[in-house]
């Protein structure tokens, strides 16, 4: 999300996240500062570690006083000391029990157990299968993600051992999301069989 949506989620009682994606560090810095103008509540930044700007973005979040960093597409261990010294809570996205355990050993404050229902490149394990196994394997809090769209999904995640949920696609059609109206309408009108999974042939579904 960009700063409008991240701030709106935080204002509504959640923890909004700015998606750094593959954006340059100064773009991320500007997004953080713009979000601070819209909310005085905590928000976080998601850093895609395969980004060519990851090293610079890692420094920016520390400099700007971001409260939470979530990470994906890479190993955040080399940034842990920097972020911990800045008082940042680090929450990596994981798609397996083995990675969850490794992140716990590395000092993660929590993990996002993200199943294949999520709208991103992740493993083949479903959310319902992954979350309880991760919850049993680590002592840090587990956040469930992938296919959760309402209170029923959240309640199910809690029963599986999660302590929170992460949602992304659920907010695509919100007025704060910087997405073309045609795309929003396609999401709203989509039925249960309309999802298409890409990337299987490259090993990144």
Language-model regions: role of each:
Residues 5, 129-143, 149-205:
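Conserved active-site-proximal phosphate/metal-binding subdomains
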Residues 1-141:
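Active-site entrance/lid segments in N-terminal catalytic domains of soluble metabolic enzymes
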